[in-house]
C-alpha cells in the first residue's frame, strides 16, 4: 500500500505528521517552537515582497504558522524517560536522624559547664534609691531637652586625663556594667516626664535602655577622642571613659564568661560591633552639638524601648519623643536660627538607625551563642541584658 504524504501547510514540503495542531514538516515545527517567543514575533517583514504569501523570511514564516493554527499551548515538556541531569541520591546522615550536629553528637547533653552568676540586685537597689532622691542639684533650663543636655555635659569624656586598659577581666566587665547603668539613671533623672512615672516603670525602662545608651556613648566618646587627639589610632575605643586599644591589651581573660578559647570569644563579641567604625566616622563628619547629641541619645533609647515592649510603654516613649522633638525644633529655630534643618536631622537619624540596625542584625548571632553555650554567664536580672551582647 502506497503511503500518502500530505504537504506541509507552512512551506509545502513533505509533512511529518501533525505538530502543534496542524500538518507540518519537522523543520517548520521546530522553527515555531523556538521562535514563538523570540524577537521575530515582534518584527515585521524583512523583505520588500509585495506577495506576502510567497515571502518566507522569519517574521512572515512565524506569522503564517500562527495564522494557519499552530498553538503554543500544545508544547510538551519533560518527556524524557531518563533525566539528562543525574541527581545522585544522598542518604540521610546519622546527625539528621539524631537531630544534632556531628561535632555535638557524642557529647553528653546533660553535662553543663559551671555557670558564672552575676548578681546585680544591689545595683538595681542603688538606682532605685537614687531615683527616690532625684538629682543631686536643682536643674534650671528652659525646656526638657536642655535639662537632659545639662545631665549629659556632666558625664562627658575627659580627654585630657585619659586612662588605658592594660588588662580586661571579670572585674573590668562588671565595672563597665555598673558605670553605665548608674550613669544612665543619673542622666535620665534630669527628664521631668520620666520622673512622673511609677518607679517600677522607671526601672523597667532603665533595664531596657542602659546598654543602648552605652553603645552610642562609646561611639560618641571615641569620635570625640579622635577629634581632640590627632594621634589616636583606629583600634582605640572609649569604654567607661577609659581607652582600650585592642592591639595592646596585654591580658584579656574570658575564662570566667566562657569555656571557649579567648580568640573565639573575642571574635564572637566583635560581631556585635560591626558597624561601630562607620558610626564613629559619621559622628566625626556630622560633629553634632551637645543638644543634638542629647536628642540622639534619647531618641535612640526611647525608640528601642517602645519597639521592644509595645503597649503602654510604646505610648509613653512616643510621648517622650514628641516632647523632645518640639524642644529640638525650638532649638533649631530660636538658638541656631536655622529654619531649614530637615537634612541635618535626617543625617543625625541615619546614625541612630545604623545603631538600631546593628542591634537587630546581631540577634541571630546571640541566638547561636545561646545554642552553643558560648557564654556561661547567668544574671539575677536576665531581662536587663537582652540585646546587650553579654548573654
Curated annotation (Swiss-Prot):
Keywords: DNA-binding, Metal-binding, Nucleus, Receptor, Transcription, Transcription regulation, Zinc, Zinc-finger. Its main location: nucleus. It is found in: Nucleus. Residues 5-77 bind DNA. GO terms for cellular component: nucleus. A zinc finger (NR C4-type) spans 8-28, 41-65. SMART domains: HOLI, ZnF_C4. GO terms for biological process: innate immune response. One of its GO terms (molecular function) is DNA-binding transcription factor activity. Residues 130-388 form the NR LBD domain. It comes from the Eukaryota. The keyword Ribosomal protein does not apply. Belongs to the nuclear hormone receptor family. Orphan nuclear receptor. This is Nuclear hormone receptor family member nhr-115. It comes from Caenorhabditis elegans. The gene is nhr-115.
Amino acid at each position: 500500500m502506497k503511503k500518502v504524504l500530505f504537504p506541509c501547510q507552512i512551506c509545502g514540503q513533505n509533512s511529518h505528521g501533525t505538530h502543534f495542531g496542524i500538518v507540518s514538516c519537522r523543520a517548520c515545527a521546530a522553527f515555531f517552537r523556538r521562535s514563538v517567543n523570540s524577537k521575530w514575533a515582534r518584527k515585521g517583514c524583512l523583505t520588500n515582497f509585495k506577495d506576502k504569501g510567497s515571502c518566507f523570511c522569519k517574521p512572515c514564516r512565524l506569522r503564517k504558522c500562527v495564522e494557519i493554527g499552530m498553538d503554543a499551548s500544545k508544547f510538551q515538556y519533560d518527556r524524557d524517560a531518563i533525566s539528562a541531569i543525574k541527581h545522585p541520591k544522598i542518604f540521610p546522615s546519622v546527625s539528621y536522624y539524631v537531630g544534632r550536629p556531628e561535632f555535638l553528637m557524642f557529647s553528653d547533653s546533660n553535662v553543663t559547664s559551671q555557670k558564672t552568676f552575676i548578681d546585680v540586685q544591689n545595683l538595681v537597689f542603688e538606682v532605685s534609691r537614687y531615683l527616690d532622691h532625684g538629682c543631686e542639684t536643682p536643674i534650671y533650663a528652659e525646656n526638657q531637652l536642655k535639662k537632659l543636655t545639662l545631665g549629659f555635659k556632666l558625664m562627658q569624656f575627659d580627654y585630657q586625663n585619659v586612662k588605658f586598659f592594660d588588662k580586661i577581666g571579670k572585674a573590668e566587665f562588671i565595672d563597665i556594667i555598673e558605670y553605665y547603668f548608674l550613669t544612665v539613671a543619673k542622666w535620665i533623672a534630669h527628664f521631668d516626664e520620666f520622673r512622673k512615672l511609677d518607679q517600677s516603670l522607671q526601672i523597667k525602662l532603665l533595664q531596657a535602655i542602659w546598654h543602648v545608651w552605652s553603645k552610642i556613648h562609646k561611639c560618641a566618646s571615641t569620635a570625640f577622642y579622635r577629634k581632640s587627639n590627632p594621634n589616636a589610632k583606629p583600634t582605640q575605643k572609649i569604654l567607661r571613659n577609659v581607652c582600650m586599644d585592642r592591639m595592646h591589651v596585654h591580658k584579656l581573660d574570658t575564662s570566667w564568661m566562657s569555656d571557649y578559647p579567648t580568640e573565639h570569644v573575642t571574635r564572637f563579641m566583635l560581631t556585635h560591633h560591626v558597624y561601630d567604625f562607620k558610626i564613629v566616622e559619621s559622628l566625626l563628619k556630622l560633629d553634632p552639638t551637645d543638644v543634638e547629641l542629647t536628642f540622639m541619645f534619647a531618641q535612640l533609647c526611647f525608640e528601642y524601648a517602645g519597639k521592644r515592649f509595645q503597649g503602654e510603654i510604646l505610648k509613653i516613649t512616643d510621648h517622650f519623643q514628641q516632647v523632645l522633638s518640639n524642644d529640638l525644633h525650638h532649638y533649631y529655630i530660636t538658638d541656631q536660627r536655622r529654619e531649614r534643618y530637615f537634612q541635618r536631622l535626617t543625617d543625625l537619624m541615619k546614625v541612630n538607625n545604623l545603631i538600631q540596625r546593628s542591634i537587630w542584625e546581631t540577634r541571630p548571632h546571640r541566638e547561636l551563642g545561646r545554642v552553643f553555650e558560648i557564654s556561661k554567664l547567668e544574671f539575677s536580672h536576665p531581662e536587663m541584658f537582652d540585646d546587650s551582647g553579654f548573654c
